[in-house]
């Protein structure tokens, strides 16, 4: 799993636990965002070349970034499954607050950001209801990818044991 929160901070040499965004004014600039997505796809491409599967965790609010990811995957004969996590704003605020209390996450999201984040159309993505337990969400994704029968037994044994 590669995520933009971690890559963004690595690019600007900001500690993952540092959430003082005012101290790093360029962290969310357009230039840093472009560089972050470029680096995300470069890392993903190296993993694909090595025969690995890759999950890219990002907002994907820009259609150009999504198209660049599709093109990169196509160059390597890799399939792309676009999933959009959807969640009631109240649950999202609570989960972000809980995550921030626990620490250990690179994300700078705050509960108040939930209502301020613009919604961007992503018609190619399959919506995923993330209000349920993590196991139920994984089941929903696996069922969507492989059908109600689930994944092949060898993978099932390894990943769900």
Question: What are the functions of these language-model segments?
Answer:
Residues 1-52:
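Conserved substrate/cofactor phosphate-moiety recognition/catalytic segment
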Residues 6-9, 60-62, 86-93, 132-135:
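Conserved nucleotide-binding/hydrolysis micro-motifs of P-loop NTPases
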Residues 50-54, 79-81:
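Loop/turn-to-beta-strand initiation segments
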Residues 98-161:
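Small-molecule kinase domains that catalyze NTP-dependent phosphoryl transfer to phosphate-bearing small molecules
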